[in-house]
């Protein structure tokens, strides 16, 4: 479970190295499959994600929930999705969200003088403003509240969903690029007097299958059109991760930053006509519990502990 892995790593690093209040960068991919990264042998080259593996720690028995909202709820609370009552993706008009009685990760970090940012997908409640991320401990939110979004038009279920701090924001551009650019802006403008918690939830490579044509053209060797687009979406995300890490380097704060990377669940083959390798077949069909990598760029220090984890 996510809570056990985070608590174990936090305890080890804090006990052995004694660093306090590092910056924390959590990056979640959406529906990233086992064979979508080149360090697992994929034809999709992901040098920046691979770099996290080569210089950090990979947990190859790191389990997440089978769908979006449950995994995100567990990550925010350190509690099981069943206990939280979130066992399926939260639909657009559903009167449900991450329980308002739950104290979540950014709220704890704010008490430790962290500036807290969420970019990208929320998917933990949007029926009333009380569920919005800026009411749950995030100082800043830039992204979408629902479970999916058009990469170019930012429309989900017939409604426009691109937000900035509880207000609709009419914005042009590819979703992955918008998230990347805002992350870089936040890093460049970060005040060193406080620590930064930056939670980046990419939409990629979740459907709809959309990517810049120049990236799609890089994968003309792939027979399936859907696979080419999917590969381009992963490529764009990997490139964005590389640029974000470079921004940390330029700001001279990479060595004091914990980087956590994972996927919320595995790939979604019925929509994508994907290579069976993405699913780790023949034993798994469709989305189910997946082994995901937990990676750190700098693993020798951390202060990432949740009081709720201690009590679970």
Show where each model-derived region lies.
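Sec-dependent signal peptide recognition
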Residues: 2-9
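Formylglycine-dependent sulfatase
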Residues: 3, 18-304
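Single conserved hydrophobic/aromatic residue that forms the stacking wall/gate
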Residues: 303-312
């Amino acid at each position: 479970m996510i809570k056990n892995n985070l608590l174990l790593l936090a305890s080890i690093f804090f006990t052995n190295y004694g660093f306090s209040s590092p910056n924390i960068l959590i990056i979640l991919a959406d529906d990233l499959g086992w064979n979508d990264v080149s360090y697992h042998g994929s034809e999709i080259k992901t040098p920046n994600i691979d770099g996290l593996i080569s210089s950090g720690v990979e947990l190859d028995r790191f389990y997440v929930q089978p769908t979006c909202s449950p995994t995100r709820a567990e990550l925010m609370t350190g509690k099981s999705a069943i206990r939280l009552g979130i066992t399926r993706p939260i639909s657009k008009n559903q009167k449900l969200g991450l329980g308002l009685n739950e104290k979540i990760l950014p709220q704890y970090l704010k008490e430790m003088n962290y500036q807290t940012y969420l970019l990208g997908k929320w998917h933990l409640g949007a029926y009333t403003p009380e569920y919005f991320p800026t009411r749950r401990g995030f100082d800043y939110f830039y992204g979408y509240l629902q479970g999916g979004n058009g990469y170019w038009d930012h429309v989900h279920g017939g409604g426009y969903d691109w937000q900035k701090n509880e207000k609709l924001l009419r914005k042009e551009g590819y979703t992955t690029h918008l998230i990347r650019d805002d992350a870089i802006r936040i890093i460049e403008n970060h005040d060193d007097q406080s620590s930064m918690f930056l939670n980046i939830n990419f939409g990629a490579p979740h459907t709809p299958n959309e990517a810049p044509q120049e990236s799609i053209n890089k994968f003309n060797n792939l027979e399936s059109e859907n696979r080419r687009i999917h590969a381009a979406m992963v490529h764009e995300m990997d490139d964005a991760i590389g640029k974000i890490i470079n921004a940390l380097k330029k700001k001279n704060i990479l060595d004091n930053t914990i980087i956590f990377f994972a996927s919320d669940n595995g790939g979604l083959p019925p929509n994508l006509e994907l290579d069976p390798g993405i699913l780790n077949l023949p034993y798994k069909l469709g989305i189910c519990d997946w082994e995901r990598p937990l990676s750190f760029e700098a693993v020798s220090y951390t202060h990432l502990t949740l009081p709720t984890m201690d009590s679970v």
